[in-house]
Amino acid sequence: MNEHRTPSEAKPARMGALARLPVFLALEGKRAVVSGGTPAAAWKVELLSAAGAQVSVYASEMSDDMRQLAADVSRGAINLHERSWRAEDLPGAAGAIGAFEDDEGAAAFAAAARAAGVPVNVIDKPAFCDFS
């Protein structure tokens, strides 16, 4: 038997709580800042580049992975700056990602990004992240 139900009788399943909301950013042609030249930072640079971002990387030392990414012109603009990041590097960026071993460096980077109005992610340090 086919019974007709009204909307109030057929309630949709409700979603449980989420720790994070999955969001996709339109980064085509927008600038992203990465602090760190490590292989982990290179992986983030590769993701940003694949999304069309113009990536500026700041690190006193760059891994081979990072140098190879920057040399691959098919990836788009990946600019390596062989120096530490500065607060003035952040304004106008669509996002900032940092690779820091210590919480002090992570906290300073996150605070500077937020002060510039830039969403920030610190690799493997969720306490300092606005997004993952």
State each model region's role.
Residues 95-101, 106-131:
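ADP-ribose/adenylate-binding Rossmann-like module
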Residues 74-91:
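Glycine-rich, highly charged phosphate/nucleotide-binding loops
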Residues 43, 51-71:
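NAD(P)-binding Rossmann-fold cofactor-contacting core
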Residues 55, 80, 119-120:
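Hydrophobic beta-strand scaffold residues
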Residues 31, 94-95:
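Structural motif
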Residues 59, 80-84, 124:
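Short loop/edge segments at beta-strand edges and connector loops
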Residues 20-49, 59:
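Glycine-rich adenosine-cofactor-binding loop
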Residues 1-26:
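Glycine/serine-rich phosphate-binding loop and adjoining beta1-alpha1 elements at the start
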